[in-house]
């Protein structure tokens, strides 16, 4: 039986096959953050010299990419990318996701928005029927912490400050347990409209286009409907 680490590697390898299909001297690849994204980054090293470069969703990923000799570009200098590859904390059959366990949710949303296709890589344990078992990360401007926490409580959540953590943008994270997420796009908009929220970790208004889920029997590929 494959371990979770081996399943993550399997998912990363499947995404690298997609990179092989689009690689070229003018191609830029968007790269996410997290343990599965780290494996993708390590595999991306073999494309050194075959890509124009990469765009990273966090300082952590940028450092790892640079360590492999891959060019890391400023998103302001990039007009489009064929794919953005990232993991997920949870993903449902609609390819809506909860992300942000690593705290990079805002930059992940920004970088993903510039890519033509969002490729989610994960092991099969991340696939759920309904989002919400994993606490929802919400990036918050520090002065708004308590006001935002009250707003999240009114939505039925139980927000908790992620102690000792500051995002790459200088903000804090509230991890929200207990939310009922029947309408992920609607809840994403509602939370994002709370003054002081930078963004929440629901990726539903713009979810993944393709999910590559590693199973004991190989890769299960899901594509967004419509």
Swiss-Prot record:
**Lineage of the native species?**
Bacteria, Pseudomonadati, Pseudomonadota, Betaproteobacteria, Burkholderiales
Q: Where does substrate bind?
A: 33-36, 86-89, 99-102, 126
State the active site. 108 (proton acceptor)
Q: Its Enzyme Commission number?
A: 5.3.1.6
Q: In which pathway does it act?
A: Carbohydrate degradation; pentose phosphate pathway; D-ribose 5-phosphate from D-ribulose 5-phosphate (non-oxidative stage): step 1/1
Q: How does it assemble?
A: Homodimer.
**Sorted alphabetically, which SUPFAM superfamilies does this protein's record hold?**
D-ribose-5-phosphate isomerase (RpiA), lid domain (SSF75445), NagB/RpiA/CoA transferase-like (SSF100950)
Among the Pfam families in the record, one is Rib_5-P_isom_A
For biological process, the GO terms are: D-ribose metabolic process; pentose-phosphate shunt, non-oxidative branch
Q: Name one GO cellular component term.
A: cytosol
Question: What is the name of this protein?
Answer: Ribose-5-phosphate isomerase A
Per the record, the similarity remark reads: Belongs to the ribose 5-phosphate isomerase family.
Which PANTHER family does the record match to this protein?
RIBOSE-5-PHOSPHATE ISOMERASE
**Record-level Gene Ontology MF annotations:** ribose-5-phosphate isomerase activity
UniProt catalytic activity: aldehydo-D-ribose 5-phosphate = D-ribulose 5-phosphate
InterPro entries the record matches: NagB/RpiA_transferase-like, Ribose5P_isomerase_typA_subgr, Ribose5P_isomerase_type_A
Q: Which keywords does the record carry?
A: Isomerase
Explain the purpose of this protein. Answer: Catalyzes the reversible conversion of ribose-5-phosphate to ribulose 5-phosphate.
């Amino acid at each position: 039986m494959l371990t979770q680490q081996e399943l993550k590697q399997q998912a990363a390898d499947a995404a690298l096959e997609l990179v092989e299909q689009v690689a070229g001297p003018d191609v830029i690849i968007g790269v996410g953050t997290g343990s599965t994204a780290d494996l993708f980054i390590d595999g991306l090293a073999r494309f050194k010299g075959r890509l124009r470069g990469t765009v990273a969703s966090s300082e952590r990923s940028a450092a790892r990419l640079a360590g492999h000799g891959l060019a890391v570009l400023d998103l302001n200098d990039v007009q489009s990318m064929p794919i953005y590859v990232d993991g997920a904390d949870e993903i449902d059959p609609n390819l809506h996701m909860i992300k942000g366990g690593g705290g990079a949710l805002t930059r992940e949303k920004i970088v993903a928005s510039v890519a033509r296709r969002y490729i989610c890589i994960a092991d099969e344990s991340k696939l759920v029927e309904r989002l919400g078992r994993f606490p929802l990360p919400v990036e918050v401007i520090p002065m708004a912490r308590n006001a935002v926490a009250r707003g999240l409580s009114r939505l039925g959540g139980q927000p908790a400050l992620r102690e000792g953590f500051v995002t790459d943008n200088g903000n804090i994270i509230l991890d929200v347990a207990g939310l009922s997420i029947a309408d992920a796009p609607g809840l994403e908009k509602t939370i994002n409209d709370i003054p002081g929220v930078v963004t929440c970790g629901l990726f539903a208004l713009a979810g993944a286009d393709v999910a590559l889920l590693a199973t004991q029997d190989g890769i299960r590929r899901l594509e967004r409907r419509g």
